[in-house]
């Protein structure tokens, strides 16, 4: 199975949907025969962000044998994570668990050596998702591991240590990262607010969310997620990524993705 290259007309429709045009979903029907799996992915992405979990899970289950039609492995992982999250909400674990086992079997047949060596990313991620489905366990991530240092350093100290030029955008982002690792959460979010208009990468948004979460400022976490959604950093893997499916990969986001009020704000930020 080879990765599918989508024509410009299809990509343009995806862009319209990404920008909030629900009417453009119907335009995908013209491509149903040629790109049925890409159509499923687009529809499922929209459904996950409308909390239409029954439809989203059904569509993603149909996609499971066809992930190799995408160039990037993160597409499969993001959709599978979203599917598992939604399935737990609507009680469809009994369908999703065997689908994950079947995906592992397909991968083992196609890439046995890589699977046995632990170098097949999707095979490994299926293991993670099975633990999530069966035991409600996800790997410890930065958000749950985070503890500020006992003796946090100030921004001035970190600038001097790193010989940073706070007038340069690259150095300003580097300072934000250093504050997250070596400074206090208060200083980290204060500095994030000062530089948030830069073209920040996803790592920096995640760090700001983690620090605001640690400080118990849930409204500020949502504000960062909104800015992250508006950045469109999440859409680079494929035109079919019409919604930020990567958000489901961050457990700290789950409470915002399942709450209609916060999800509405995230959608509005996407359409921005």
Provide a role label for each language-model segment.
Residues 1-7, 28-35, 162-168, 195-197:
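TPR-adjacent "capping" and linker segments in tetratricopeptide-repeat scaffold/adaptor proteins
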Residues 8, 39, 75-79, 121-125, ...:
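The tetratricopeptide repeat
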Residues 1-22:
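N-terminal leader/linker segments that initiate helical-solenoid repeat arrays
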Residues 12, 43, 79, 83, ...:
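Structural register within alpha-helical repeat arrays
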Residues 93, 97, 103-121, 136, ...:
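Alpha-helical protein-protein interaction modules
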């Amino acid at each position: 199975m080879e990765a599918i290259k989508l024509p410009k007309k299809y990509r343009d429709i995806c862009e319209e949907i990404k920008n909030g045009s629900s009417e453009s979903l119907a335009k995908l029907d013209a491509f149903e025969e040629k790109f049925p799996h890409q159509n499923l992915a687009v529809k499922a992405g929209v459904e996950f962000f409308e909390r239409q979990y029954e439809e989203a899970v059904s569509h993603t289950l149909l996609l499971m044998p066809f992930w190799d039609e995408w160039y990037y492995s993160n597409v499969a992982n993001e959709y599978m994570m979203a599917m598992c999250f939604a399935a737990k909400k609507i009680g469809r674990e009994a369908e999703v668990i065997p689908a994950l086992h079947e995906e592992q079997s397909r991968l083992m047949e196609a890439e046995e050596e890589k699977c046995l060596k632990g170098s097949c990313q999707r095979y490994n991620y299926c293991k993670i998702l099975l633990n999530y489905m069966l035991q409600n366990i996800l790997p410890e991530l930065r958000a749950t591991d985070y503890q500020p240092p006992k003796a946090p350093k100030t921004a001035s100290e970190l600038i001097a240590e790193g010989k940073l030029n706070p007038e340069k955008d690259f150095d300003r982002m580097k300072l934000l990262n250093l504050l997250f690792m070596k400074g206090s959460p208060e200083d980290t979010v204060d500095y994030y607010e000062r530089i948030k208009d830069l073209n920040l990468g996803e790592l920096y948004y995640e760090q700001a969310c983690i620090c605001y979460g640690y400080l118990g400022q849930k409204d500020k976490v949502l504000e960062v997620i909104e800015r992250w959604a508006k950045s469109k950093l999440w859409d680079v893997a494929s035109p079919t990524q019409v919604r930020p499916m990567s958000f489901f990969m961050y457990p700290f986001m789950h409470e915002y993705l399942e709450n209609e009020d916060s999800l509405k704000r995230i959608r509005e930020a996407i359409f921005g």
